[in-house]
């Protein structure tokens, strides 16, 4: 059986880890980095992922996608999506089913399809390290992700060619990474996870006893649309407003300028975590009739903190709710762990310290802990890690819509998963022959105020007065936090059961098509790589041949020179095209045309070898005249 890898599919950065010699190891990508920017760019002939995509974003802003995780499993009309529509340089559109999709070069794409490109890079990184094909993975998601978002993440894995063995919550993964070596005693840990696009708080009890470890999530809460991207946007808007005041020009109308501004704002935010002031300097940011304009604005740490203060305060309310749900107070928390790049901001650390009354731990890498935890969970599933039990929870309550548009809960939030629950319902009207089961997720009493996960019908109910038929509804949540629902007419035994797929989301056919597309692109990518390799080899041969022609000088007959030049011209022409076979044919013809050149080079080399041999003989003759002296070691006479 091959290795199961652990992937942290992040909003801003992604990371992959694998168990190596019993320890989780974070892997370096092809660029030599341990984390990969979650950025995907589409050009005319290729898909670019990670740092190379980030580098070209300024020149290709409308086809470079970042923070796609904020759209995964969401509807276009969602308030959170509408906020992003107005600030993202790329196009966010409504799919036929109402989902939020993106568009590049006329192609409409679902977020799982785009996210799959990042997962493919993580898969390739692991394969390069392991030297074998990887087909299975554990992928992390924010603890507060709903059912639709979890399903969409699994779809992304499938499109990338991965069998997702488990979806694990990010704070739980971080707790695994922290606690796996803590072998004795009980600890109650608060994991504060403020990443690029999401915020989670999980209260986790780690029980270590005689080598056995149990990680039990007591409560979780959060906000799936609050993270470092929002901090960046506050700074971007401030810089754009300041520039408009000074120059009278609105940079928000210029995608190219906004992409440069985004990069500069992110850099300034990071710098202000270690310094008290910095300067954003962007020459030639835009131009008007009077000429080019430059943006030069000084930012202090205090200014940044004032811009994002309310965002930091927003993270504190879920902390209070999670503690209340776990029936704990801040004094019950033994350790606080910070996860996610945004927790490097001193003001965030200060807020967490003040809330819990203790300093967070500094020995957990906020960028890598989640991937490490995913790799450990992968080890648990494969049997490589023993004596570890992980008890996670469902973040939101689950139920169905009942008479009066009320949500009746079957499974309360923070229930340990996997779990089952059932309840008997009846009909609302006389002689009702069918019932609609409308499945909801959320905490509100009013059905319409909660997230609709989908609905299905149970028909064939025997006619009877209202309230008499007995319909048993069963909810079954698996270890991934994904819901399966069944409804049974207890009198007839007729049953209808489904895995909940939201009214949004990708159908099986769509996912299958995207898998086929990804496989086709894999072939295309391989062909493109081979084409580039052939071009590079041909170009290198032309360069080397030119040099040899110059070195040969008059020793090369003019007839051969003309033949070689014609062959080099043919290679140059072939390189400009996309026909690999034509390039290889032209390359071979150049090698054959250069036969005389090779003879001259070999003759010259042999002549040089003869000269060197003569020089060697002379050196030996000189050496023969040297008389060896006899030296004695003189030792100090120490008395």
UniProtKB/Swiss-Prot annotation:
Induction: By stress conditions e.g. heat shock. CDD domains: ASKHA_NBD_HSP70_DnaK-like. Keywords: ATP-binding, Chaperone, Nucleotide-binding, Phosphoprotein, Stress response. Residues 625-639 have a biased composition (Acidic residues). Transmembrane segments: none annotated. One of its GO terms (molecular function) is ATP binding. The modification Phosphothreonine is found at residue 198. Residues 602-639 are annotated as: Disordered. PROSITE patterns: HSP70_1, HSP70_2, HSP70_3. Acts as a chaperone. NCBIfam families: PRK00290.1, PRK05183.1, prok_dnaK. Belongs to the heat shock protein 70 family. This is Chaperone protein DnaK. It comes from Shewanella baltica (strain OS195).
């Amino acid at each position: 059986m091959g290795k199961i890898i652990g992937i942290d599919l992040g909003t801003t950065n992604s990371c992959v880890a694998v168990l190596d010699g019993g320890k989780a190891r974070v892997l370096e990508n092809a660029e030599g980095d341990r984390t990969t920017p979650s950025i995907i760019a589409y050009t005319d002939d290729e898909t670019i992922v990670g740092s190379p995509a980030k580098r070209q974003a300024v020149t290709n802003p409308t086809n470079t996608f970042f923070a796609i995780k904020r759209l995964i499993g969401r509807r276009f009309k969602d308030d959170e999506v509408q906020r992003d529509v107005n600030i993202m340089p790329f196009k966010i559109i409504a799919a036929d089913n109402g989902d939020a999709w993106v568009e590049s070069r006329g192609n409409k794409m679902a977020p799982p399809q785009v996210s799959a490109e990042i997962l493919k890079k993580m898969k390739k990184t692991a394969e390069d390290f392991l030297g074998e094909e990887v087909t299975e993975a554990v992928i992390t998601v924010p603890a507060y992700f709903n059912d639709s978002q979890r399903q969409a993440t699994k779809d992304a894995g499938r499109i990338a060619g991965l069998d997702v063995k488990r979806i694990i919550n990010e704070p739980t993964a971080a707790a695994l990474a922290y606690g796996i070596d803590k072998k004795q005693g009980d600890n109650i840990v608060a994991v504060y996870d403020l990443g690029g696009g999401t915020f989670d708080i999980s209260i986790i009890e780690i029980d270590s006893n005689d080598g056995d470890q149990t990680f039990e999530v007591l409560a979780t809460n959060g906000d799936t649309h609050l993270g470092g991207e929002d901090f960046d946007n506050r700074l971007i808007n401030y810089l754009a407003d300041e520039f408009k005041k000074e120059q009278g020009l609105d940079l928000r109308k210029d995608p190219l300028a906004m992409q440069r501004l985004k990069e500069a704002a992110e850099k300034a935010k990071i710098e202000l975590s270690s310094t008290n002031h910095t300067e954003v300097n962007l020459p030639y940011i835009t131009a008007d009739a009077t000429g080019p304009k430059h943006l030069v604005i000084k930012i202090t740490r205090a200014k940044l903190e004032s811009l994002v203060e309310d965002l930091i305060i927003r993270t504190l309310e879920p902390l209070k709710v999670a503690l209340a749900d776990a029936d704990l107070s801040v004094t019950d928390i033994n350790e606080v762990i910070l996860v996610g790049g945004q927790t490097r901001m001193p003001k965030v650390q200060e807020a967490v310290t003040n809330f819990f009354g203790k300093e967070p731990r500094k020995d957990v890498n906020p960028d890598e802990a989640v991937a490490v935890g995913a790799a450990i969970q992968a080890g648990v599933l494969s049997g490589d890690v023993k004596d570890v039990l992980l008890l996670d929870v469902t973040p939101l309550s689950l139920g169905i819509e009942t008479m009066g548009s009320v949500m009746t809960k079957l499974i309360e939030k923070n229930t340990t998963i996997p779990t089952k629950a059932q309840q008997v319902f009846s009909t609302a009207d006389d002689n009702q022959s069918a019932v609609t089961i409308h499945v909801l997720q959320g905490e509100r009493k009013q059905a319409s105020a909660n997230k609709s996960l989908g609905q299905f019908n149970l028909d064939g109910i025997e006619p009877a007065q209202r309230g008499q038929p007995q319909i048993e509804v069963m909810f079954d949540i698996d270890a991934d936090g994904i819901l399966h629902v069944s409804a049974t007419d207890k009198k007839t035994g007729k049953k209808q059961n489904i895995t909940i797929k939201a009214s949004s989301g990708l159908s099986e056919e769509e996912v299958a098509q995207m898998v086929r597309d990804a496989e086709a692109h894999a072939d295309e990518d391989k062909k493109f790589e081979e084409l580039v390799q052939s071009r590079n080899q041909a170009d290198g041969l032309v360069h080397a041949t030119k040099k040899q022609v110059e070195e040969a000088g008059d020793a090369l007959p003019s007839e051969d020179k003309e033949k070689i030049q014609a062959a080099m011209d043919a290679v140059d022409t072939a390189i400009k095209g996309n026909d690999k076979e034509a390039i290889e044919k032209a390359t071979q013809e150049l090698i054959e045309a250069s036969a005389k050149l090779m003879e001259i080079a070999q003759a010259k080399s042999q002549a040089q070898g003869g000269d060197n041999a003569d020089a060697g003989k002379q050196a030996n003759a000189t050496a023969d005249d040297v008389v060896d002296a006899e030296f004695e070691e003189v030792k100090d006479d120490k008395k």
